[in-house]
Amino acid sequence: MDNSAQKNERTGKHPRRASEVQKGFTAAYPTQSSIPFKSQASVIPESEKKGFNSQAKRFPHKKNDIPGPGFYNVIHQSPVSNSVSLSKKGTCMFPSMCARLDTIISKYPAANAYTIPSDFISKRDFSNSCSSMFQLPSFMKALKFETPAPNYYNASVSCCKQRNNVCTRAGFMSKTQRGSFAFADKGPPPGHYDINESLVKQSPNTLMSCFKSKTNRGLKLTSTGPGPGYYNPSDCTKVPKKTLFPKNPILNFSAQPSPLPPKPPFPGPGQYEIVDYLGPRKHFISSASFVSNTSRWTAAPPQPGLPGPATYKPELPGKQSFLYNEDKKWIPVL
């Protein structure tokens, strides 16, 4: 048994009995555990057990091989591959003679062309931020930038314009320019230019289509009613004259045709029928089988001869006695 245990320790293997779970009663003395495990003791240094005013470094500086900002060289390579298998004439019906990806000219400096201040490059110890030790003043004077302020530089117009890189040789080539349009620098102010009246006036009566519409598109409808100031309130309405039949009527079975009466003039102000909306009209409307004749509206206003609600003097009837006579009748006592 001792030799086998030594062999297992040398080879790094656990004994067979230790890997199996033992069942049953075990004594209370220290024995070898039935389940293998790996124990790892964690050692806490004394520097981390300190509470306030701890001088332990929170951010230790680790050295690695990764270069910092501004310490590497960027090489811009063309993404277009010069492979022999690619056809120079293209693969479409009308091949283009220009490159698909133009050379990109960067307008900004490269990553290693910046001048970074030394304050940003220098490493600081942030572990002393909450300590009671003496520290250097953290507020420093702002650096004066050498770049121009707004409205103090002339932006190049050539960079803002759109470049015309259309160099295709298609079968149906468009003659429309793809670049920016040239606008006039100075234009006439409002009211100082001539409008082409041919666009405003009615078009001539020429054949434009098979079924041309004759409806006017720009004319306003004339009003059929009278305008303001046309009414005369003092003038009375004229009664149309009756048409007289001729003296020698023609012998017909039907009566003589009479002309239509003329249209009455439009009513002026004050000639309309004004409806009294204060008193609503009474309409007894009901859908029941027994229609009630009781008015559902407010009562009529009181007349001047009727008494008011406080002019009555009601008399309470007193007690009265009755006698029961021989005829079995009740007789009131006087």
From Swiss-Prot:
Q: Which residues, renumbered to this chain, carry the PTM Phosphotyrosine?
A: Y72
Q: Annotated region Disordered: where? A: 1-60
Which top-level group of life is the source organism from?
Answer: Eukaryota
Q: Name one Pfam family in it.
A: SHIPPO-rpt
Ranges for the STPGR repeats: 67-74, 109-117, 148-155, 187-206, 225-257, 267-282, 306-316
Q: Does the keyword Metal-binding apply?
A: no
Q: Composition bias, kind Polar residues: at what positions?
A: 29-42
Entry keywords, A to Z: Apoptosis, Cytoplasm, Nucleus, Phosphoprotein, Repeat
Cellular compartment(s): Cytoplasm; Nucleus
Q: Give the GO biological process terms.
A: positive regulation of apoptotic process; positive regulation of mitochondrial membrane permeability involved in apoptotic process
Cellular component terms (Gene Ontology): mitochondrion; nucleus
Question: Does the entry feature the keyword Protein biosynthesis, yes or no?
Answer: no
The Basic and acidic residues compositionally biased stretches are 7-20
- What function does the entry list? May positively contribute to the induction of apoptosis triggered by O(6)-methylguanine.
Into which family does the record put it?
Answer: Belongs to the STPG1 family.
Fetch the PANTHER family from UniProt.
PROTEIN STPG4
What name goes with this protein? O(6)-methylguanine-induced apoptosis 2
Q: Where does this protein come from, organism-wise? A: Homo sapiens (Human)
> What phylogenetic lineage does the species belong to?
Eukaryota, Metazoa, Chordata, Craniata, Vertebrata
| Gene name of the encoded protein | STPG1
